[in-house]
């Protein structure tokens, strides 16, 4: 099993972790609400976990353009 992190805005792969490197408890998933967990985490048939996050480029774009938070997506 591996954890794969992808940007929720542009889809770029941010990184991956092998499950043997870290326990899922240390990732803080238990602190998410059920709605957040459903929106951010998906479990694949092969046992991998895909997590939606935000990449540095998209975070910088949001920091420079706060009104982008109003949109479901700001990538065109």
From Swiss-Prot:
Superkingdom per UniProt: Bacteria
What job does the chain carry out? An anti-sigma factor for sporulation specific sigma-F factor, by antagonizing sigma-F it allows the switch to sigma-G factor and progression to the late sporulation development stages. Might stabilize or process Holliday junction intermediates, although this may be due to polar effects on the downstream mfd gene.
- Protein's name according to its UniProt entry: Anti-sigma-F factor Fin
Q: Transcription regulation among the record's keywords? A: yes
Which molecular function GO terms apply here? metal ion binding
- State the UniProt keywords alphabetically: Cytoplasm, Metal-binding, Sporulation, Transcription, Transcription regulation, Zinc
Loss of this gene results in the following: Cells missing this gene prolong the activity of sigma-F factor and do not fully induce the activity of sigma-G factor; sporulation efficiency is reduced 50-fold with most spores arresting in the engulfment stage (III). About 10-fold increased sensitivity to DNA damaging agents, 60% reduced chromosomal DNA transformation; plasmid transformation is unaffected. Partially suppresses DNA damaging agent sensitivity of recU deletions. Partially suppresses DNA damaging agent sensitivity of recU deletions.
Q: Name one GO cellular component term.
A: cytoplasm
**Motif YXXY per record, residues:** 68-71
Q: What subcellular locations does the record give?
A: Cytoplasm
Per the entry, which co-factors are needed? Zn(2+)
Which Pfam families does the record match to this protein? Fin
The UniProt induction remark is: Induced at 2 hours after sporulation onset as part of the sigma-F regulon, followed by further induction after 3 hours as part of the sigma-G regulon; its concentration rises throughout sporulation (at protein level).
**Organism from which the protein derives:** Bacillus subtilis (strain 168)
Q: Where does Zn(2+) bind?
A: 7, 10, 55, 58
Transcription as a keyword? Answer: yes
Q: Name one GO biological process term.
A: regulation of gene expression
């Amino acid at each position: 099993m591996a954890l794969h992190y992808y940007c929720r805005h542009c889809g770029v792969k941010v990184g991956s972790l092998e499950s043997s490197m870290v326990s899922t408890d240390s990732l803080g998933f238990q602190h998410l609400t059920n709605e957040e967990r459903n929106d951010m985490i998906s479990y694949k048939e092969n046992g991998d976990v895909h997590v939606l996050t935000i990449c540095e480029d998209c975070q910088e774009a949001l920091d420079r353009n706060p009104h982008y938070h109003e949109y479901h997506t700001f990538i065109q």
